[in-house]
C-alpha cells in the first residue's frame, strides 16, 4: 500500500469510524469563544467544553484531522521551523476522543492496532512511555499488547502528565515512539528515550487519559466519567510510513519545496543550506489556512502573527535570490495538495492569493530600506566589538520598517549577534505608555478622572433622541476647562451634562449632534456631543447668552436639519455595507466608519481596488434600495434572536444581552445604536466620491447623499463645462478630445524611445571597445546612458549578444537614482559566476538592493555618486567567483 499523506489521513478517520467514532470536521484555526487561545493548536480544542461538561454532543466518540498552528503565545514553534526535521507552524493533528465512553484499555488497543495492523509498522521498533505511577497503563501495554517491559518506560510529570490548566480535568498520558535506527543516534552520552530529544526516538502518538479533576489546592479527585484525548501529527507518522528522515521529505511538503526550487533556480539540500526552502514550505501552509479562516495581516493579535510568518518567509526568499513577490504563487500548490481534504482553501484560493500578494508588495516597499538600516546597525555593533543588537534599534526596525522581532533576530544570528529582547520590550512598552498618555490628555476638556467621578455621582445620561429632537431636562453638571463649576457666563467654553438629552453622543462612527440648550435667558450653543466615561452624554459648546447654571431647567434642541443629513448618511452606510457584500463577496466586513452631515466614510475588508464595473454596481445597488423606498424598521431584541434572524453584528463591537436592530425592508439588517431615516427614499441619491487603500487588506469608500450628492453633481457638471470650454469642444466630446491628445502624446513618446534606442546602439560600439579580461573571462563593466531600467536591460541584451561569451555589469543614472544590470552567458554561469550576487554587491555600495538569477539580475541604488565604486566592487567579487 502506498502511504501518501492524504491516504494516511483517510485511513485514520475510516479506522476510527469503523470503531464507532463520528468523523468531525476540523474546527477553524481561529478558536470559537475561547479567548485563552491565539490559534487552534490541538485536536481537543473544539471539544474543550465537552470535556469540561459545559456542552453536550450527539456522540460519545469522535475522530478528527485538526488544522493546527503553533506560532505565538504559549505554543510557539516558529523559531525551530526549518531547523529540525519535525517542527512546523502549521500541521495536522489526527485524533480520537472519548467523552466518558471507553478509556485506557480501548485507547491503547486502538492505537496499537492502527499502527501495526493498518499501517504495518514493525512491532519490535515501537516503544511506550507511561506516567511514573500509572500501573494500569503499564500493565495494559505489557499484558494486553505484549510489549516487553524493557520497551515500556515510566517518566515523570513533565513528559507524561497532561492538564488543561492549573485547575480542571487532567491525567496521565502514554506516548508511543518508534526507534528509527542507530544511524540517527545523537552525540549525547546516553541516547535514549527520556534522556535526549534526537531524531532516532520519534514520538508518534500521545494518548491522554483524563481521569482526575484538580482543584485550587492541587487536590486531584477521580472524574465520574473519565475521557480520552489523543493526538498524532500527520506529518510525523507520514514521514515514518514513507521511510524518509524528515517531514519535509514527505509528499505533504516536498512538492512545495520543489516549486520553490523552480522559483529561485537553486537545488534544495537537506542540510543547513535547505533551511530557507523548509521555512517557505512550512510558512505558506500557515498563511494559506490562516487567511482562509479569516485572519488578515495586521499589527496586532492573530493578524500580527500572520504578518510575521509571511514576512519571515519573504525574507528567506531573498536569501534564495527571490527579489519579488512570490509566496502567492505557491498557494495553488498548497490547494492542489490539500484542497480535497479542506475544500474551503480551494474556494478561497483567489482571495488568499490576493491577500498574500498585497502584503508581499507592502513589505517589499519597506524591506530594501530596512535591510540597509539593519546592515548598518549590525556593522556598527561589530565595529565596536559588541555581540548584541540593542533593543531600541530592533524596535526601530519593527516600528519604522515593519520588521517583526524574530526577523531582527534572524538577521542578528546570521551575523553572530543576539538581540536585546528586554530592551526591545522596554521600547515597545514605552511606546504603549505614550499612546496611553495621549489618550488621557484633555482634548475633550476635563480629564477622564473627572468624568469617571461625575458618572459615579450622577449615573448615566438617559438618551431620548431616537424619537424626537427636542425635550426638557435639568443641568446636572457644568465643566469649564478642567474644573467643575456651578455657573458659566457668556463667552465661556463649557461641557454640560444633562439628566436626559435628545442629543446623540458620538458613537459607532456617527458624529455627535449640535444645537442649543436654553435655560431662561441663558443659551448654550452646542457644537458637539460626546460620550465620556462610557455613560455620560457631554455637550461641548459655548455660552452664547446669559449665565448658565447647574440645576437650571433647560430645553434641549437638536439642530434637526443636521440630524437628518447625518441620518441620510448613516442609513446609506448600511445599504453600502450590504451592496459591498453583494458585489465583492461575503468576505467584506465593516472595519470602521464615519458618518457626518456632509458625507459618509466606510472602511471594509477587501484586497484590491474596485474596478469601474464594481464601482458602478455598488453605487447602483445602493440607489436601487433607495428608489425602492424600503421601510426602515427599528426594534430591540435579544442578541441570540438577532443573530438567528440574520442581523449583521459588526466585528469587534461589544453587545449586551439586548440589542437594537435596524432593518431596511428585506435588504439590510444590522445591529446599530445610531439614528436613522424612516424610509430609504429619504436618502434621495447616493454618489460614490472615492475608493482607496488604507492598510493591508483594508479599503475605504467615501460617498455623499441627499443635498450633498446634488452639490457634488453640480460641481462635476461645472468641471465638465470648464473642460469643454478649454478644449473647445461640446461637453459630450470631452472624452474623445482627451483620448486624441493622449494618443498624440503616446506617439511622441514612441518617437522618443526610438531615438533613444538608436543612440544606445551607437553607444554599444564604444562600450565594446572598453571590455577587459578577468581570469580568462571577457568582462564589460561600464557606466552607460539609459533613461530607465527597460532601456538598460535592452542595452544589456544587445551587448550580451555581441559578446557571445562573457559577463556584463552596467550602471546608469536615472534622475537621483541608480539602475544596475548584470548578465552572464550560460558557459560563464557554469564557471561559478552569479549575476544576482554581482548586482547585489554593486547595489550595496549605492545604498540599494536587488538580485536575481545567475544569468540575469537587476538592482537599484540611491547614491549616483558611488556608481563607479559600485562597478569596481562587482568586478572584485567577480574575480572571486570565477572558477
From Swiss-Prot:
Role summary: Catalyzes the attachment of alanine to tRNA(Ala) in a two-step reaction: alanine is first activated by ATP to form Ala-AMP and then transferred to the acceptor end of tRNA(Ala). Also edits incorrectly charged Ser-tRNA(Ala) and Gly-tRNA(Ala) via its editing domain.
Entry text on domains: Consists of three domains; the N-terminal catalytic domain, the editing domain and the C-terminal C-Ala domain. The editing domain removes incorrectly charged amino acids, while the C-Ala domain, along with tRNA(Ala), serves as a bridge to cooperatively bring together the editing and aminoacylation centers thus stimulating deacylation of misacylated tRNAs.
UniProt xrefs under PANTHER family: ALANINE--TRNA LIGASE, CYTOPLASMIC, ALANYL-TRNA SYNTHETASE
EC number: 6.1.1.7
Subcellular location: Cytoplasm
Cofactor(s), by name: Zn(2+)
InterPro entries, A to Z: aa-tRNA-synth_II/BPL/LPL, Ala-tRNA-lgiase_IIc, Ala-tRNA-ligase_IIc_anticod-bd, Ala-tRNA-synth_IIc_core, Ala-tRNA-synth_IIc_N, Ala-tRNA_ligase, Ala_tRNA_ligase_euk/bac, DHHA1_dom
Any one GO molecular function term: transferase activity
Cofactor binding comment, as recorded: Binds 1 zinc ion per subunit.
Keywords associated with the record: Aminoacyl-tRNA synthetase, ATP-binding, Cytoplasm, Ligase, Metal-binding, Nucleotide-binding, Protein biosynthesis, RNA-binding, tRNA-binding, Zinc
Gene field: alaS
UniProt family annotation: Belongs to the class-II aminoacyl-tRNA synthetase family.
GO biological process, one term: alanyl-tRNA aminoacylation
Species: Heliobacterium modesticaldum (strain ATCC 51547 / Ice1)
NCBIfam families, per database record: alaS
UniProt-annotated binding residues for Zn(2+): 570, 574, 672, 676
One of the record's GO cellular component terms: cytosol
Protein's recorded name: Alanine--tRNA ligase
Major localization listed first in the record, in broad terms: cytoplasm
Amino acid at each position: 500500500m502506498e502511504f501518501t499523506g492524504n491516504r494516511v489521513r483517510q485511513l485514520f478517520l475510516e479506522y476510527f469510524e469503523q470503531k464507532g467514532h463520528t468523523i468531525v470536521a476540523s474546527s477553524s484555526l481561529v478558536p470559537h469563544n475561547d479567548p485563552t487561545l491565539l490559534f487552534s493548536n490541538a485536536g481537543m480544542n473544539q471539544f474543550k467544553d465537552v470535556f469540561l461538561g459545559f456542552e453536550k454532543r450527539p456522540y460519545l466518540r469522535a475522530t478528527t484531522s485538526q488544522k493546527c498552528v503553533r506560532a505565538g503565545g504559549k505554543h510557539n514553534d516558529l523559531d525551530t521551523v526549518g531547523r529540525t526535521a519535525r517542527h512546523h507552524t502549521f500541521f495536522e493533528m489526527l485524533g480520537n476522543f472519548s467523552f466518558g465512553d471507553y478509556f485506557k484499555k480501548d485507547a491503547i488497543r486502538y492505537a496499537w492496532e492502527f499502527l501495526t495492523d493498518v499501517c504495518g509498522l514493525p512491532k519490535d521498533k515501537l516503544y511506550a512511555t507511561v506516567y511514573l505511577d500509572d500501573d494500569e497503563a503499564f500493565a495494559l501495554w505489557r499484558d494486553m499488547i505484549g510489549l516487553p517491559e524493557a520497551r515500556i518506560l515510566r517518566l515523570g510529570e513533565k513528559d507524561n502528565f497532561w492538564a488543561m490548566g492549573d485547575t480542571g480535568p487532567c491525567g496521565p498520558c502514554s506516548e508511543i515512539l518508534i526507534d528509527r535506527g542507530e544511524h540517527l543516534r545523537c552525540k549525547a552520552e546516553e541516547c535514549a528515550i527520556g534522556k535526549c530529544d534526537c531524531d532516532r526516538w520519534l514520538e508518534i502518538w500521545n494518548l491522554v487519559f483524563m481521569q482526575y479533576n484538580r482543584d485550587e489546592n492541587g487536590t486531584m479527585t477521580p472524574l465520574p466519567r473519565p475521557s480520552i484525548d489523543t493526538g498524532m501529527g500527520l506529518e510525523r507518522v507520514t514521514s515514518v510510513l514513507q521511510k524518509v528522515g524528515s517531514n519535509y521529505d514527505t509528499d505533504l511538503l516536498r512538492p512545495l519545496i520543489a516549486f520553490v526550487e523552480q522559483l529561485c533556480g537553486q537545488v534544495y539540500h537537506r542540510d543547513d543550506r535547505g533551511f530557507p526552502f523548509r521555512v517557505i514550505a512550512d510558512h505558506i501552509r500557515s498563511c494559506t489556512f490562516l487567511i482562509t479562516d479569516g485572519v488578515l495581516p495586521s499589527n496586532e493579535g492573530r493578524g500580527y502573527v500572520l504578518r510575521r510568518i509571511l514576512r519571515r518567509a519573504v525574507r528567506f526568499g531573498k536569501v534564495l535570490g527571490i527579489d519579488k513577490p512570490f509566496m502567492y504563487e505557491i498557494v495553488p500548490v498548497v490547494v492542489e495538495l490539500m484542497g480535497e481534504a479542506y475544500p474551503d482553501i480551494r474556494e478561497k484560493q483567489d482571495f488568499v492569493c490576493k491577500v498574500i500578494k498585497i502584503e508581499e508588495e507592502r513589505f517589499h516597499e519597506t524591506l530594501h530600506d530596512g535591510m540597509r538600516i539593519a546592515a548598518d546597525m549590525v556593522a556598527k555593533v561589530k565595529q565596536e566589538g559588541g555581540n548584541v543588537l540593542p533593543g531600541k534599534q530592533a524596535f526601530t526596525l519593527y516600528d519604522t520598517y515593519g520588521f517583526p522581532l524574530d526577523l531582527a533576530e534572524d538577521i542578528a544570528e546570521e551575523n553572530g549577534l543576539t538581540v536585546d529582547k528586554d530592551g526591545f520590550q522596554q521600547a515597545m512598552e514605552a511606546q504603549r505608555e505614550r499612546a496611553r498618555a495621549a489618550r488621557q490628555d484633555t482634548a475633550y476638556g476635563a480629564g477622564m478622572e473627572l468624568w469617571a467621578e461625575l458618572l459615579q455621582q450622577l449615573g448615566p445620561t438617559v438618551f431620548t433622541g431616537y424619537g424626537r429632537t427636542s425635550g426638557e431636562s435639568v443641568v446636572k453638571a457644568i465643566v469649564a476647562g478642567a474644573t467643575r463649576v456651578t455657573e458659566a457666563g457668556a463667552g465661556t467654553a463649557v461641557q454640560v451634562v444633562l439628566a436626559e438629552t435628545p442629543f446623540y453622543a458620538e458613537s459607532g462612527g456617527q458624529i455627535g449632534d449640535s444645537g442649543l440648550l436654553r435655560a431662561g435667558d441663558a443659551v448654550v450653543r452646542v457644537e458637539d456631543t460626546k460620550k465620556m466615561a462610557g455613560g455620560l452624554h457631554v455637550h461641548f459648546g459655548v455660552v452664547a447668552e446669559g449665565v448658565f447654571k447647574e440645576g437650571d431647567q433647560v430645553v434641549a434642541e437638536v439642530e434637526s436639519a443636521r440630524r437628518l443629513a447625518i441620518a441620510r448618511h448613516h442609513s446609506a452606510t448600511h445599504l453600502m455595507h450590504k451592496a459591498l457584500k453583494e458585489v465583492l463577496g461575503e468576505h467584506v466586513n465593516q472595519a470602521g466608519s464615519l458618518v457626518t452631515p456632509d458625507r459618509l466614510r466606510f472602511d471594509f475588508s477587501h484586497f484590491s481596488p474596485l474596478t469601474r464595473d464594481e464601482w458602478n454596481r455598488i453605487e447602483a445597488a445602493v440607489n436601487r434600495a433607495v428608489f425602492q423606498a424600503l421601510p426602515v424598521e427599528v426594534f430591540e431584541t435579544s442578541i441570540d434572536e438577532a443573530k438567528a434572524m440574520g442581523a449583521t453584528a459588526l466585528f469587534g463591537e461589544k453587545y449586551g444581552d439586548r440589542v437594537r436592530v435596524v432593518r431596511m425592508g428585506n435588504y439590510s439588517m444590522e445591529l446599530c445604536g445610531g439614528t436613522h431615516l424612516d424610509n430609504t427614499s429619504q436618502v434621495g441619491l447616493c454618489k460614490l466620491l472615492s475608493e482607496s487603500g488604507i492598510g493591508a487588506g483594508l479599503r475605504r469608500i467615501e460617498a455623499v447623499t441627499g443635498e450633498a450628492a446634488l452639490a457634488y453633481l453640480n460641481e462635476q457638471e461645472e468641471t465638465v463645462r470648464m473642460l469643454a470650454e478649454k478644449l473647445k469642444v461640446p461637453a459630450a466630446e470631452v472624452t474623445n478630445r482627451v483620448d486624441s491628445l493622449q494618443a498624440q502624446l503616446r506617439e511622441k513618446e514612441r518617437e522618443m524611445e526610438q531615438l533613444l534606442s538608436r543612440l544606445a546602439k551607437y553607444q554599444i560600439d564604444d562600450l565594446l571597445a572598453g571590455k577587459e579580461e578577468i581570469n580568462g573571462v571577457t568582462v564589460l563593466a561600464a557606466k552607460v546612458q539609459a533613461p530607465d531600467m527597460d532601456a538598460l536591460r535592452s542595452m544589456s541584451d544587445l551587448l550580451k549578444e555581441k559578446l557571445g561569451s562573457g559577463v556584463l555589469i552596467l550602471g546608469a543614472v536615472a534622475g537621483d537614482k541608480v539602475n544596475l544590470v548584470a548578465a552572464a552567458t550560460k558557459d560563464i554561469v557554469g564557471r561559478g559566476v552569479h549575476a544576482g550576487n554581482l548586482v547585489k554587491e554593486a547595489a550595496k555600495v549605492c545604498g540599494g538592493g536587488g538580485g536575481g538569477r545567475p544569468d540575469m539580475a537587476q538592482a537599484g541604488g540611491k547614491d549616483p555618486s558611488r556608481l563607479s565604486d559600485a562597478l569596481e566592487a562587482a568586478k572584485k567579487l567577480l574575480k572571486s567567483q570565477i572558477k
